Amino acid sequence: MQEIEIFCDGSSLGNPGPGGYAAILRYKDKEKTISGGEEFTTNNRMELRALNEALKILKRPCRITLYSDSQYVCQAINVWLVNWQKKNFSKVKNVDLWKEFLKVSKGHLIMAVWIKGHNGHAENERCDSLAKLEAQKRTKTIT
């Protein structure tokens, strides 16, 4: 099983508001960066969108170490998700994205590692900048 690192971040201006996401996928010395966004969203949705879009790129089951500054995403993957499924996602926010995560993560072994945001972690800083740029692209200017 290939070992992959994924770094991801999400941003929302206004929360909710225009949002962006970015992820870096790394396998050995190869790297791929993705980014995108939505017109009206939250930072948690963008964090999760970054991860889901990154997972869609992988063509075979992998052992993944996910690095995120989102306690929400890390705790959900490492702790909460099992119980959420047992309770049929009752009272869980962003159910659509969590159900998508379950589909796109199938076959992968994922360990989520929380990293402190805005603390000089190079890949997190890159993702943060890209996510903010994507969010800014989606702000409507009033004329």
Swiss-Prot record:
Protein family per UniProt: Belongs to the RNase H family.
InterPro entries, A to Z: RNase_H (IPR050092), RNaseH-like_sf (IPR012337), RNaseH_domain (IPR002156), RNaseH_sf (IPR036397), RNaseHI (IPR022892)
Cofactor(s) of this protein: Mg(2+)
Catalytic activity as recorded in UniProt: Endonucleolytic cleavage to 5'-phosphomonoester
Protein name as it appears in the record: Ribonuclease H
Record's function text: Endonuclease that specifically degrades the RNA of RNA-DNA hybrids.
Binding site for Mg(2+) 1: 9, 47, 69
Complex formation: Monomer.
GO CC, alphabetical: cytoplasm
Enzyme class: hydrolase
GO biological process, one term: DNA replication, removal of RNA primer
Subcellular compartments: Cytoplasm
E.C. number(s) listed in UniProt: 3.1.26.4
Coiled coil stretches, renumbered: none
Predominant location: cytoplasm
Residue stretches making up the RNase H type-1 domain: 1-136
Gene name tied to this protein: rnhA
Residues at which Mg(2+) 2 binds: 9, 128
Name of one Pfam family that matches: RNase_H
Cofactor note text: Binds 1 Mg(2+) ion per subunit. May bind a second metal ion at a regulatory site, or after substrate binding.
Molecular functions per Gene Ontology: magnesium ion binding; nucleic acid binding; RNA-DNA hybrid ribonuclease activity
Keywords tagged on the record: Cytoplasm, Endonuclease, Hydrolase, Magnesium, Metal-binding, Nuclease
